[in-house]
Regions:
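Hydrophobic/small residue at the entry helix of a nucleotide-binding pocket
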Residues: 44
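N-terminal charged helix/coil linker that caps or initiates catalytic domains
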Residues: 1-37, 70, 323-329, 343-394
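Cys/His-rich short segments
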Residues: 255-353
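Glycine-rich phosphate-binding loop and adjoining beta1-alpha1-beta2 segment
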Residues: 4-5, 57-100
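The feature captures the short pre-catalytic strand/loop hairpin that immediately precedes
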Residues: 171-210
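ADP-ribose/adenylate-binding Rossmann-like module
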Residues: 126-166
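Conserved anion/nucleotide-ligand pocket segment
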Residues: 126, 196-237
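A structured beta-alpha segment of the ubiquitous adenosine-cofactor-binding alpha/beta core
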Residues: 85-138
């Protein structure tokens, strides 16, 4: 009987990955050369990182802003009692490299919504989510689609959970699945779709290590199939796997793609520039794109930047932060205590009084991608000089 996959002598050599290589379609070198982002290092995130590490994924980027609490210890295989108070991402990265020295893992204490450049997503083979809120999921979805990268979402509640796969150009994306209620909750900055109001207000998240291991296992298994895309393996692209741990029922749902979904915007052409978000000024960037596109070109951002807060009493103060990051105290007048209004921009036309600032000084992250627009045509430019800093030690 013939097979589409052939084994050679190296497939039978005994090493760390020898049993994996016995799978006919398995290519360990792909895993070794893969770069995967894990967003969230809680219950699901721990299982994702553990699985990626055991499989020998070459580079793992771990994003989480939270510190370890004692309640994490019942659901997180990578954490110990002595780790309480430390950042989850840092401990998870350390443990991953202890488990498998072949793996390089790096922690990022960063907000996935505002602090991660699109060029980082662009360098991923896949993004895996272990998140507890819609807003972060939507941000990941939009970032992945802009740079044409797949991502796999996971969520759990008590004994139940689901895993969903979103691949640009293959069925629905995360935003396609969102309801009017989802949008209302995002606007209210509510957490997790699976939580009751009382649980959210009390900060109690009903999760178990058993359900997290099931869902994370499905997520990583789907990632493996995406990494072996040329093997024509069936995936859950545009679909969700739903698991009921109480009855052990499970089923697959297919989501309806919305043709007018705003998240389907993909950057067709991205030009790598020797720019740095830390060192290259907005003035320099604007001058360079005008040299390429024409004198009327403007520099476009994918976010609104709050520039100045203003009070009716005459007091002004500089902000230079994404509007998403604005908090009440930032808009309280230091002089009279009144609520201030603010000005914002999402593009640079050349007449601004802050052109000598760098992107980072106005809230644009390392290795990001910005647009150079003239008329209705946009060309996209990446701050490629930041790659060395972001991927240092990886």
């Amino acid at each position: 009987m013939s097979s589409d996959f052939e084994l050679n002598n190296s497939d039978f050599e005994e090493d760390r990955y020898s049993r994996l290589r016995l799978i006919p379609w398995w290519d360990q070198d792909r895993l070794k050369n893969a770069t995967i982002m894990v967003v969230g290092a809680g219950a699901i995130g721990n299982e994702l990182i553990k699985n990626l590490t055991l499989l020998g994924i070459g580079r793992i980027l771990i994003y989480d802003m939270d510190a370890i609490e004692s309640t994490n210890l019942t659901r997180s295989i990578l954490y110990r009692a002595r780790d309480v108070g430390r950042y989850k991402a840092e401990v998870a990265a350390e443990r991953a490299m202890e488990i498998n020295p072949d793996v390089k893992a790096k922690a990022f204490i960063a907000n996935i919504i505002d602090d991660v450049g699109l060029g980082v997503f662009r360098r991923m083979n896949a993004v895996l989510g272990g998140l507890d809120n819609r807003e972060a999921r939507l941000a990941i979805n939009q970032s992945c689609y802009k740079v044409n990268r797949p991502w796999i979402d996971g969520a759990i509640e008590a004994l139940n959970g689901f895993a969903r796969v979103f691949v640009p150009g293959q069925g629905a994306c995360y935003e396609c699945t969102m309801t009017e209620m989802d949008w209302r909750l995002i606007n209210k900055r509510k957490s997790c779709a699976l939580l009751t109001h009382e649980q959210m207000s009390e900060g109690k998240i009903p999760t178990t290590p058993t359900s997290s291991s099931v869902i994370a296992g499905i997520q990583v298994q789907e990632m493996l199939k995406l990494l072996h895309a040329d093997r024509k393996l069936p995936t859950l692209a545009g679909k969700g796997y739903v698991f009921n741990g109480l009855t052990h029922d499970s089923y697959v749902v297919e989501y309806q793609r919305k043709d007018d979904c705003m998240s389907h915007d993909t950057y067709e052409k991205i030009i790598e520039k020797p720019w740095s978000a830390r060192a290259t000024s907005l003035r320099e960037m604007l001058a360079e794109i005008r040299g390429e596109l024409g004198e009327k070109a403007v520099l476009d951002f994918d976010r609104d930047i709050a520039t100045t807060a203003k009070c009716s009493c005459g007091e002004n103060k500089a902000l230079f932060t994404p509007v998403h990051k604005l908090k009440g105290e930032m808009l309280t007048c230091p002089k009279c205590g009144a609520q201030m209004t603010f000005d914002s921009v999402h593009s640079i036309a050349g007449d601004e009084d802050f052109l000598d600032k760098t992107p980072m000084e106005i809230g644009i992250p390392l290795l990001h991608i910005v647009g150079g627009r003239i008329g209705m045509d946009t060309t996209y430019y990446e701050f490629t000089s930041d790659e060395a800093e972001v991927f240092e030690n990886l």
